[in-house]
Amino acid sequence: VLHPQGYDSFGLPAEQYAIQTGQHPADTTRMNIEGGVDKSGNTIQGYRNQLDRIGFSFDWSREVRTSNPDYYKHTQWIFIQLFESWYNKNSDKAESICTLIQEFEKNGNAKVNAVCDDNIAPFSAEDWKSFSSEQQQKILLQYRLTYLAETEVNWCAALGTVLANDEIVNGVSER
């Protein structure tokens, strides 16, 4: 039996380590997985070497790294699909945002039965056509399956990075 192997190697811990050591996250991640000598001259064994020494039969051709563009391009693609969709309660499925725009152009939003923000003002087809492109985009954001929103960010000026919620205790960085 050949076992696949994967590394969840994308995100704040990898970025934080790179900031602390003054190295690019791609370099530190690759070094941690493959091993070698880092910029400080330290020998890094690497996860792959350690796993090979255990004696398991890993199929390295099936290795997955979440930091690899071949992996995360699929995640990005999924979010684009979600962003370009809205949920039509009448058909009980997600549909292309283009169908919603067509409905707005023909009838406004009076007959739209969608999962959306609660505070959407009714508008007619004439209203829709008179809205600026920016106004139309703001309205569409209220219907999209994924959306942009203002939110609080835990910025740490001392570290020069955003901190995850679990790194904040009583409003102060744990680091």
Feature map (PLM): residue ranges:
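N-terminal, positively charged nucleic-acid-binding surface of large information/translation enzymes
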Residues: V1-R175
